[in-house]
């Protein structure tokens, strides 16, 4: 799959932007703060319904505007598809596919991308929440129906936490909470699907991760990934603010039927402590993935270069997995300001690793940072304006309209 045309209205620093895109590599180049990352951020939003830079949609709407619009013309095997999302400041977001209204969470069914940015170093060095988000985004891109499962789990978790907080405030005992049993069952039923799906995903990622790491780093440091499950922990961690999970190796759980009894036992075991804390202490929202290099945890032991190579390999492995599974061609691969962070050898190896993808979109502040064969088609960005780009294809006006 490739993006033939991207159109933005009131997105970030763009009042309006239109750019035609070609197969192969396209380089968006411009000084920092000019808006090049905003273009690829918009495409990332279409496939993940989130930004790699901010946690709230509001920041994506241009100051003074009430909504932002992202439109893309997609092409695969000679067929075209128009997708659109309207991000609203004071109402729910809206979406269209070929002018037909749809739920925003359905968009990943039609468009997949894998974006790598400097912020992704936190996948190796940061908190578990980022690693969970990586897995869940990839789950939805591979199996779109899981977007509903993840949403259902969040709702059940919120309801259960509300009940636990209320019970703590009123000093209620465990045997006085019949309603909690209902939410326990629902949390276990939904959460077990997520745990199993993540486990199967990590298992599928492993061989691709090993190949991608070797391609980027040029050495085999034995990269590995293993799920760590809070339902297996005796102590799930005291500091929920810091997101310390206390989870244990759960690599064997790839079927929800195997997870259910273990999750059920963990919920029962932790109920007294959860009533004390007013918080659900076990479940997929508290899990992690342990990354290792040379048998040691990458977090805390890997060098800066090794951490970069591991993070890059994770994204390349994700892209290869989507490419292998997809019936609509390769995911669009997005490299946001990546080459500036790499030495010359890694730049060359990364360029070689991404060359085979149908479409690769790259941003850079310095033209010379990007290997020449990836920079042949350059789009220059200056002060929120696109210059020196191919003439945009005919597209609907991005101003005034929105997703119906």
From Swiss-Prot:
ATP binds at residues 30-37. It is found in: Cytoplasm. InterPro entries: DNA-binding_RecF, DNA-binding_RecF_CS, P-loop_NTPase, RecF/RecN/SMC_N, RecF_2. GO terms for cellular component: cytoplasm. It comes from the Bacteria. GO terms for molecular function: ATP binding; single-stranded DNA binding. Belongs to the RecF family. The RecF protein is involved in DNA metabolism; it is required for DNA replication and normal SOS inducibility. RecF binds preferentially to single-stranded, linear DNA. It also seems to bind ATP. This is DNA replication and repair protein RecF. It comes from Clavibacter michiganensis subsp. michiganensis (strain NCPPB 382). The lineage of its organism: Bacteria, Bacillati, Actinomycetota, Actinomycetes, Micrococcales. The gene is recF.
């Amino acid at each position: 799959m490739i993006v033939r045309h991207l159109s933005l209205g009131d997105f970030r620093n763009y009042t309006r932007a239109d750019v035609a895109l070609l197969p192969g590599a396209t380089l968006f180049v411009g000084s920092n703060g000019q808006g090049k990352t905003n273009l690829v951020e918009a495409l990332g939003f279409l496939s993940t319904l989130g930004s790699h830079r901010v946690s709230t949609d509001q920041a994506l709407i241009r100051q003074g505007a009430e909504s932002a619009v992202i439109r893309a013309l997609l092409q695969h095997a000679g067929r075209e598809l128009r997708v659109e999302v309207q991000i609203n400041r004071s109402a729910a977001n809206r979406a269209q596919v070929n002018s037909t209204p749809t739920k925003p969470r359905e968009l990943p069914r039609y468009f997949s991308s894998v974006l790598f940015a400097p912020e992704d170093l936190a996948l190796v060095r940061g908190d578990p929440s980022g690693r969970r988000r990586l897995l869940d985004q990839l789950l939805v891109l591979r199996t779109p129906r899981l977007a509903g499962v993840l949403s259902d789990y969040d709702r059940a978790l919120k309801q259960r936490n509300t009940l636990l907080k209320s019970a703590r405030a009123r000093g209620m005992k465990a045997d006085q909470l019949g309603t909690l049993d209902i939410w326990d069952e629902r949390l276990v039923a939904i959460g077990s699907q997520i745990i199993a799906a993540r486990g199967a995903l990590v298992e599928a990622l492993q061989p691709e991760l090993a190949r991608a790491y070797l391609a980027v780093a040029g050495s085999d440091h034995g990269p590995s990934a293993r799920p760590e499950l809070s339902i297996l922990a005796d102590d799930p961690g005291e500091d929920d603010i810091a997101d310390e999970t206390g989870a244990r190796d759960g690599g064997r759980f790839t079927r929800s039927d195997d997870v259910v009894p273990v999750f059920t036992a963990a919920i029962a075991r932790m109920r007294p402590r959860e009533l004390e804390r007013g918080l659900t202490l076990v479940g997929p929202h508290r899990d992690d993935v342990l990354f290792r290099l040379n048998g040691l945890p990458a977090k805390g032991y890997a060098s800066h270069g090794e951490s970069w190579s591991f993070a890059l390999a994770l994204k390349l492995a994700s892209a290869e997995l989507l490419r292998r599974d997809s019936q609509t061609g390769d995911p669009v691969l997005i490299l946001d300001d990546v080459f500036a962070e790499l030495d010359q050898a890694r730049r060359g190896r990364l360029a070689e690793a991404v060359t085979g993808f149908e479409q690769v979109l790259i941003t850079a502040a310095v033209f010379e940072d990007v290997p020449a064969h990836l920079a042949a088609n350059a789009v220059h960005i200056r002060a929120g304006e696109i210059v020196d780009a191919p003439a945009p294809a005919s597209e609907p006006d991005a101003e005034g309209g929105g997703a119906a």
